[in-house]
Amino acid sequence: MLHKYLKLICLLAAICVLCIISQNSTKIWGALKLPNSHYYSNTSMISSIPKMSVSPVKSLTETELRVKEILEKLDRLIPPRPFTHVNTTTSATHSTATILNPQDKYCVGDQLDILLEVRDYLGHQKEYGGDFLRARMFSPALKAGASGKVTDFNNGTYLVSFTLFWEGQVSLSVLLIHPSEGASALWRARNQGYDRIIFKGQFVNGTSHVFTECSLTLNSNTEECKYLNGRDQDVFYCMKPQHMPCEALTHVTSRNRDISYLTSKEKNLFHRSKVGVEIMKNQHIDVSQCNKSKEVKEKCQIGMKIPVPGGYTLQGRWLTTFCNQIQLDTAKISGCLKGKLIYLMGDSTLRQWIYYLPKVMKTLKFFDLHETGNFKKHLLLDAEKHTQIQWKKHSHPFVTYQLFSVIDHGYIPQEIDRLIGDKDTVIVITFGQHFRPFPIDIFIRRAISVRQAIERLFLRSPATKVIVKTENIREMHIEAERFGDFHGYIQYLTLKDIFKDLNVGVVDAWDMTIAYGTNNVHPPDQVIGNQINMFLNYIC
């Protein structure tokens, strides 16, 4: 009898367990769900079930901590500067510049220091720093120029230092690009939203073409396609078109959205008359050679630390201050490039390089890859010398009115991971201009991902050469909130911080384009030629 009761109790217990499992099956199987591996080439529809991370928790935590550290550093660099009236903001006209320890005679190699005291429109001395300034010295007749170094004492005074690199009459310039109140407003506005740019994705299914809105962030109110790079968690979303799969996305374009996060009062700081105003009017000095001996410098090599400024222009030629730079002729360039595989990864400022090179090396010919548009992959070949040079655009965000293909594009870290590398492989990287309209954390994460990909490359191929080209300065009066140089300067500082101590060569295009005074996102051929010559000095 006892045996029958025990069997009955076991049966009832089993029935209860089955009921519990049935009622909670979604939770149980959801908890056991294994992570999916996603790469950018894969597409998936957004579901309501949260997906587990594909990256190790440790590496994600390290990245998040690094992002947080950099953001905190930048927030300290650009503190909030609220103001009640434009009259209390920095005025170039009312500010003063005083040459310290003026000399009767200046010699090549001397340092010239200038004390800058900034005041507001009412003539009151400012009590804090943060103004976005640009210092430059130049001699138009000599086609000479160099940037100056600005030290902010955070009390309304600045030290502007120039190294006198050439003899002759030298003009001095310190531009107030934006007052500290404007810089603070741009920083706050930048990090408030992702919607200054509208992306449109083209989906193709046979003869049907449909455009839907795309974004770097998820709009949870609509059914969307998610394009995910699993390793670095880079993601791009598009609204899913009806009757088409997510895999049907072929092209993307973008437009500026009519939106601003600046107040009406703040917008007054960015009128053309208030951007790039000269503080030092008609200031110049005469510099003599003084028979000073020239310092003997070692050959330019990858991994060298670059001072500020890192060089200057004279007779239109860029001359470095930290290494012995050689002006390479056609024969030397030809010999250097023999057997080289060169990968240019980035934006249209690097595409200028691949357009310029055939003008110097007539044996380099474009190979037709049967792609269309300005942002197609470009390939230069010299079959006899076994030279290959490729330019490929970086992935999202890529801002352009022109339609570009997303069939064969990848994030720079992905492209680096696909390369085997060897002593004759060279990679050149640039990114930044297309990141300016978006919160800075996107740029920070991408820069960290690129660094990590380079470190992985060096593990499997330490002999591979990597060169980083920084951003060019661009048009002075372009829309400051979306594309202005203040955003570029913050990215320039961030990139230098993230890439410090990494064994790469740097073509400091920011410093170079200030020296040339181009103020053009696509500088003329003379500047491009000198950027390329600096690059060749690293690899030849």
Swiss-Prot record:
Gene3D superfamilies: Immunoglobulins (2.60.40.10). InterPro entries: Ig-like_fold (IPR013783), Ig_E-set (IPR014756), NXPE4_C (IPR057106), NXPH/NXPE (IPR026845). This is NXPE family member 1. Disulfide bonds: none annotated. Belongs to the NXPE family. Residues 1-22 form the signal peptide. One of its GO terms (cellular component) is extracellular region. Keywords: Glycoprotein, Secreted, Signal. It is found in: Secreted. It holds the Pfam family NXPE4_C. Intestine, and to a lesser extent in kidney.
